Amino acid sequence: KKDNLYQVNFLDYLAMNYFQGCSLLLDKWIKDLVLKHYSTDVEHDYLINSIAASYNSMYFYNKPLFQYRLHEKNSIGAQYDTQTKEEHLQRANTLKIRTQNAHNALNVLNIIRLANSDYYQENQEEFSHMSTFFNQHIQALENKKFFELLCQNTSPYYSLIKTKKARVMDLLYVLKEKVIR
């Protein structure tokens, strides 16, 4: 709802950067944590928001605060406007793209382990299960394991890193790779 303030849950934010930092307000203690645990493995705005969310301190204010123009539609990510559907599908159908969210999630879990040890300790068993799943997911894609990927759809962790459409794309990626061989 417009003009509402929403708290962002850490798990909702785990695998991808929903909130770019073009308009971001943060407390000094978050800034200090981010600087202490800065890593080029995770984009800076993603890092800031992940750490804040792990402390239940990430909020989204659903109100445009200024115009951020990369092009006439006032949106970020202009490269997608210039891609054809075929170019987008070809780009999305690479191992790097198919495994990107799982790698992101593993990097964020590791950073949170260091930056918010209390949160990590409270959720250590869950973090361990997630890490295992994300690593198995990467391996299934790397090794073109169709049935492993299919079975992964029963895991609640898959929906943390992939939409249903992306899961279908994973299966198509593996099938395509098997057919080409």
Where are these regions (language model features)?
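C-terminal subregions of glycosyltransferases and related glycan-biosynthesis enzymes
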Residues: 41-42, 69-181
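Conserved nucleotide-sugar donor-binding catalytic segment
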Residues: 2-81
